[in-house]
Amino acid sequence: MPRRSLHAAAVLLLVILKEQPSSPAPVNGSKWTYFGPDGENSWSKKYPSCGGLLQSPIDLHSDILQYDASLTPLEFQGYNLSANKQFLLTNNGHSVKLNLPSDMHIQGLQSRYSATQLHLHWGNPNDPHGSEHTVSGQHFAAELHIVHYNSDLYPDASTASNKSEGLAVLAVLIEMGSFNPSYDKIFSHLQHVKYKGQEAFVPGFNIEELLPERTAEYYRYRGSLTTPPCNPTVLWTVFRNPVQISQEQLLALETALYCTHMDDPSPREMINNFRQVQKFDERLVYTSFSQVQVCTAAGLSLGIILSLALAGILGICIVVVVSIWLFRRKSIKKGDNKGVIYKPATKMETEAHA
């Protein structure tokens, strides 16, 4: 083969290799789902990391929480996306994903982490408890993930996804409540991405409006992607306080999408797209807040419950003390009256009048 042809072939080979994704490719064209033969119980057969250490999501409970005063508030730079720009919304067969620009980034971590996409996890209309992370065993209605990659060390999210300290994900717990106009800027486009592979463009808006109040309060731990290949390369920030969306908005999320293509003869609804909580392997979760809030099914914190209990006990004590005081006062008064009747002087006076 002529030298020029060899050189051209070598260049072509380098170009092909450069274009290949850095993240692990499916084994033998494998696919994955949340249920069935390719469900999460089988993930580790094709994606070994899914059965390894540092897996996510986890249950956030008091036994594993430790306050860390060095956890400072994060700063969200470039989150206010211009309404004049359009951003791609995609049904990827597992969730609905919104692509984000890399100039949107987090400050406050050891490196700069630039945004790449956001997506959601949810349950189903009959069991609307589809968050991935749980708090003291309790699921929330849904969960938002905003995915960032370490742009100080790696050129893109694909390269960073299987590298140490490669990814940082912000997790927002979502509960049912009042209508949320910011989330509706995504939900209003769901009908345009109903089937797998469908895409639509969403005008830019302030992504920071998707975050909860008091973002300085959060849980922090090292974990993994919650979907295959489950790379244990994620620095998780799970915000302590949830956001609310309305029942109608949640229902739209739970019923609008399909995991299958439009022409699939056996369409499958996109529901229950959340991974079960994983073993925690004696890790610790660090908190930026000193008083741990444990959420209950009623939505009350442990502090509020204890306050109500103490108030109830105090009220009972007051009632008991007042009752004893009234009883003793009545007894003393009755004793005084008996004393007046049986005084000797009174008896003598009675006998004189007889």
From Swiss-Prot:
Binding-site positions, Zn(2+): 119, 121, 145
Reported disease: Hyperchlorhidrosis, isolated: An autosomal recessive disorder characterized by excessive sweating and increased sweat chloride levels. Affected individuals suffer from episodes of hyponatremic dehydration and report increased amounts of visible salt precipitates in sweat.
Gene3D superfamilies registered for this protein in UniProt: Alpha carbonic anhydrase (3.10.200.10)
Residues on Cytoplasmic side: 323-354
Keyword Transmembrane helix attached: yes
Disulfide bond annotation, renumbered to this chain: 50-230
Reaction it catalyzes: hydrogencarbonate + H(+) = CO2 + H2O
PANTHER family the UniProt entry points to: CARBONIC ANHYDRASE, CARBONIC ANHYDRASE 12
Protein name: Carbonic anhydrase 12
Family the UniProt entry places it in: Belongs to the alpha-carbonic anhydrase family.
Activity regulation annotation text: Inhibited by coumarins, saccharin, sulfonamide derivatives such as acetazolamide (AZA), benzenesulfonamide and derivatives (4-carboxyethylbenzene-sulfonamide, 4-carboxyethylbenzene-sulfonamide ethyl ester, 4-(acetyl-2-aminoethyl)benzene-sulfonamide, 4-aminoethylbenzene-sulfonamide) and Foscarnet (phosphonoformate trisodium salt).
Recorded topology in the membrane: Single-pass type I membrane protein
Swiss-Prot/TrEMBL keywords: Cell membrane, Disease variant, Disulfide bond, Glycoprotein, Lyase, Membrane, Metal-binding, Signal, Transmembrane, Transmembrane helix, Zinc
Keyword Lipoprotein assigned: no
